[in-house]
């Protein structure tokens, strides 16, 4: 299991490659990225399945403020002999400013015929209906937006096995967004 956190650099490139060589292997890759101002994050992943009956699961989440930008390029490669592969690749992007940008290029290269593989990417803004609902319950807009961002990242944070590290991540994200979301 791998959990990556991208927050501080002006420009950063993150590359991760998993190579599954043993039957029954189970690989998990998670990432959360908070980008602001003119930060750029380039994320590239490859999940290579060379053995049968193996699982890989990738979930990358990005929240983008200001003029920040993210690029996700992911590939699941399944070799001919890697039957019964179960592989997933998901990239989700939350645009918090109209000038923020997210680009995603998920891909599959499958040479085996008995597999369950999927990939997907979504990019969107804060759901206005959800925001309206929270505000109609007396929650100020700024707090409602912050709660939605925290909820967006919680799916990745809950994968962190150390409670102390998970709490530190929550604090880091909370501090990052307390002044940025209006």
Report residues per predicted region.
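Small/polar glycine-rich anion-binding or flexible loop at a beta-alpha turn
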Residues: 127-130, 146-155
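Conserved beta-strand/loop scaffold segments within soluble protein domains that form the structured core
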Residues: 1-132, 136-139, 160, 164-182
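Small-residue helix-packing motif on alpha-helices
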Residues: 25, 144-145
